[in-house]
């Protein structure tokens, strides 16, 4: 039994991987731009603008998109079970990263405290960059989710079920074997107690 999805071909998966790499590189470049932008601020009366996304380095998480995209491209050419499982795990990680990064960006854009007038322009530009990055997160989420769903077309589910059944049988056999050992040990203890009682009675 296999989950087949003929609409997603190897060429389409390669395109998805390339788009992931491009998104990841763009995020890393934007992180470098924001780093230079915020480091160039001047400490005034109202301080500098340092949002939570800058402190957490969420744009730098684009490296995960680059790595996932590279594995996706390679998995499209070499469709081995281990490669597909590894790539699917990375894409699931990217889904989690996009959700967290988008949440932090929304928190940043929903609050804006007063900053020094000298840093207002930099803060405004940084928030615009965050808005652009926020628009790219749904695209990365959709790509990672699409690959995670379509990758089941290359995974033999019957072998996975068989391996799970085999592991379950081994665990149950081990538990039964331990129970038999405990019962045998209990019987031996009872035998020793009865022999001891007989010896004491004869004495």
From Swiss-Prot:
**Compartments where found:** Membrane
TM region positions: 15-35, 56-76, 84-104, 141-161
Q: What is its main location?
A: membrane
Output the superkingdom of the source species: Eukaryota
The record describes its membrane topology as: Multi-pass membrane protein
Q: InterPro entries of this UniProt entry?
A: CD20-like, MS4A
Recorded GO CC terms: membrane
Task: Output the Pfam families linked to this UniProt entry.
Answer: CD20
Q: Which UniProt keywords apply?
A: Membrane, Receptor, Transmembrane, Transmembrane helix
Its family remark reads: Belongs to the MS4A family.
Record's function text: May be involved in signal transduction as a component of a multimeric receptor complex.
Q: Please give the PANTHER family that the UniProt record associates with this protein.
A: MEMBRANE-SPANNING 4-DOMAINS SUBFAMILY A MEMBER 13, MEMBRANE-SPANNING 4-DOMAINS SUBFAMILY A MS4A -RELATED
The protein depicted here goes by the name: Membrane-spanning 4-domains subfamily A member 13
| Organism from which the protein derives | Mus musculus
């Amino acid at each position: 039994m296999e989950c087949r999805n003929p609409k997603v071909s190897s060429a389409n998966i390669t395109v998805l991987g390339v788009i992931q790499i491009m998104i990841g590189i763009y995020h890393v470049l934007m992180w470098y731009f924001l780093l230079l932008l915020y480091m160039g601020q001047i400490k005034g009366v109202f301080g500098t603008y340092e949002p939570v996304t800058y402190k957490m380095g969420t744009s730098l998480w684009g490296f995960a998109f680059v790595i996932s995209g590279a594995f996706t491209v390679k998995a499209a050419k070499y469709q081995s079970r281990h490669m597909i499982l590894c790539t699917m795990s990375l894409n699931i990680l990217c889904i989690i990263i996009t959700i967290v990064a988008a949440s932090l960006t929304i928190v940043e854009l929903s609050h804006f405290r007063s900053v020094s007038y000298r840093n207002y322009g930099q803060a405004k530009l940084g928030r615009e960059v965050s808005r652009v990055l926020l628009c790219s997160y749904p695209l990365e989420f959709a790509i990672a989710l699409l690959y995670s769903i379509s990758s089941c077309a290359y995974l033999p589910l019957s072998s996975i079920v068989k391996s799970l059944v085999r592991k379950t049988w081994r665990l149950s056999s081990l538990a039964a074997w331990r129970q038999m050992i405990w019962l045998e040990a209990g019987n031996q203890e009872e035998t020793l107690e009865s022999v001891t009682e007989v010896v004491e009675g004869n004495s």
